[in-house]
């Protein structure tokens, strides 16, 4: 039995939390409080992690600060056009090694789990958390002093919902929940298809 929420239809019934979450860009510029932000990071903290290594780290900056301007400067122009109304910018990084110095092959995967928890919590709190890859990774590493044994993974724009009219006209048609590939394209029994 399928389910429809937010103009998204599932092939099997799942909890609404997964269908409600999407990545809008229209933000109001209104401040997200420190308490709201720490609640998002608390959700991220409880993500599953291989061997409980918890390799994720977050560097954040609040709007109207020099730190925010530093993070904003890392973005490509496309993302600057809509992130101008974000309340918080976050750089997600992950530690490539364990505490004993061994390689952690799943550090990026674990950081992705933490990001997913943060995104779901934001959706539950009626906040936007929009993940981005469009930024200067090497400049982020330099500006933020990220050590060599860490990988810069992604950036996140966090904010309160705004008006679609405040977005550049070219982005307005994209301000809707997107669909997903059917299960038959992503799930294979026994081995990868030929």
Task: Mark where each language-model region is.
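Acidic, surface-exposed loops and disordered segments
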Residues: 1-194
